[in-house]
Amino acid sequence: MAEVLFFVPAAVVLCFLLQRRCRRSMEMPQYNYFRDLLLVAAWVLAALWAGSSVSRFIVGMAAFASLIGTCQHIRPHWGWKTVYLFVGLLFAFFGPKIGFIGLPDGQYHYFSPEVSIIATALWVGVFPVLLQQLDNIPGMAGHLLAVSFSLLLLATVFSGQDLPDAFFMSLCGLAFLGVFWSRHGHMYRRMGESLSAFWGVLVAGTSVLGVSKGITFSTL
């Protein structure tokens, strides 16, 4: 916990200063590309420095999804969207899984291993495509991500459970969205396929860790 509370503010300050410095010497397309790389690098370093193996896996899968988004941008084709289901399958086989869903009156329905893999693969595979669709309206995806990570963080803090991975991912998500807000929440600029896919896996993976899948689904 101490590492998280030290590294995240330090990373936010460093990212802010680097953006201010590079903005003066770069053209806008170069500057936006630099900020995208800086965002991914900040997530990777945060996971390596202060995250657990689960957090590192989620960030790694998000980076992989962003590469698919880059290919999707370079060679547009509807078939790229089906590749995110492959990302979801990899996530389901090697990462955290959706083991149950909450029901009314505090009851839970637990999945069999096979159903758990299918549910997780669909959950993680759909979110990158969903955010890309939301990103067709400039600023929409960024604002909904901010709402989602805020609710994820609140749900984690007040759940009464020990959920360090969910807390770490939610805090990083909110902090990095804030410091790169002009890239995500700009009302006349889209995030793009790569960044949308990156955040889609992050928010889907974070919601799998805690008690907040229903919150994430309802928000988005």
Go through each PLM region and give its residues:
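Alpha-helical transmembrane segments
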Residues: 1-25, 35-67, 140-220
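Aspartate-rich (DDxxD/NDxxD/DxxxD) Mg2+/diphosphate-binding motifs
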Residues: 26-31, 74-77
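Hydrophobic alpha-helical hairpins/lids featuring a short glycine-rich hinge
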Residues: 54-89
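Membrane-embedded alpha-helical core segments of multi-pass
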Residues: 63-67, 87-98, 119-129, 145-151
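Transmembrane alpha-helix interface/packing and boundary motifs in multi-pass membrane proteins
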Residues: 71-72, 127-135, 180-189
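Short acidic, Gly/Ser-rich segments with clustered Asp/Glu that frequently serve as metal-coordination loops
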Residues: 74-76, 126-148, 197
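Short aromatic-rich membrane-water interface segments that cap or initiate transmembrane helices
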Residues: 106-118
